[in-house]
Amino acid sequence: MTQPIIPRVGIASDAHQVEPGKPCWMAGLLFEDADGCEGHSDGDVVSHVIVDALLSASGLGDLGSFVGVGRKEYDGVSGERLITECRQLLAENGFTIGNVAAQMIGNRPKMGPRREEAERRLTELVGAPVSVSATTTDKMGFTGRGEGVAALATAVVWKAGA
């Protein structure tokens, strides 16, 4: 009798402060009508939270241990590169990605009109289905005041023979 493959689930959250004048990268897309988020990278909160959820599900650490804050080679790094390198790390460790669900929390950028485009791009990068949703906090808290953007993600992975 063969061993069943048991899925592993990871969750993650991330938040960044809005930085006026910085290009807005979110969910792998450039939003030219919104300010971006501060950070040592491109500030793509959705891409970051996807990486964090994948690392959580696989037990391979978190975004901080994966890229670190003080590593110069990751200054300004794109969310696309982070996802690509994370996907490679999971594959090297025998993991297959099942799917990812990510939710952006904030007033801007407006994800609704580009949600399907974001899902296509992230699905391509992750190599598995990615669903994207967005919500606001009805003017409450730092995201409601437009001071920042947050995101949540859940990822499902499995390891053959585990």
From Swiss-Prot:
EC number from the UniProt entry: 4.6.1.12
GO terms of biological process kind: isopentenyl diphosphate biosynthetic process, methylerythritol 4-phosphate pathway; terpenoid biosynthetic process
GO molecular function (one): metal ion binding
Coiled-coil stretches noted in the UniProt entry, renumbered to this chain: none
Catalytic reaction equation(s): 4-CDP-2-C-methyl-D-erythritol 2-phosphate = 2-C-methyl-D-erythritol 2,4-cyclic diphosphate + CMP
Protein's pathway: Isoprenoid biosynthesis; isopentenyl diphosphate biosynthesis via DXP pathway; isopentenyl diphosphate from 1-deoxy-D-xylulose 5-phosphate: step 4/6
Gene responsible for this protein: ispF
Keyword NADP: no
Entry cofactors: a divalent metal cation
Lineage: Bacteria, Bacillati, Actinomycetota, Actinomycetes, Mycobacteriales
Keyword rRNA processing annotated: no
Alphabetical keyword list: Isoprene biosynthesis, Lyase, Metal-binding
Residues the record marks as site: Transition state stabilizer: 40, 136
CDD domains: MECDP_synthase
Assigned protein family: Belongs to the IspF family.
Binding site for 4-CDP-2-C-methyl-D-erythritol 2-phosphate: 14-16, 40-41, 62-64, 135-138, 142, 145
Subunit structure comment from the entry: Homotrimer.
Cofactor binding, per record: Binds 1 divalent metal cation per subunit.
Domain of life per record: Bacteria
Sites where the protein binds a divalent metal cation: 14, 16, 48
Name used for this protein in its record: 2-C-methyl-D-erythritol 2,4-cyclodiphosphate synthase
Function according to Swiss-Prot or TrEMBL: Involved in the biosynthesis of isopentenyl diphosphate (IPP) and dimethylallyl diphosphate (DMAPP), two major building blocks of isoprenoid compounds. Catalyzes the conversion of 4-diphosphocytidyl-2-C-methyl-D-erythritol 2-phosphate (CDP-ME2P) to 2-C-methyl-D-erythritol 2,4-cyclodiphosphate (ME-CPP) with a corresponding release of cytidine 5-monophosphate (CMP).
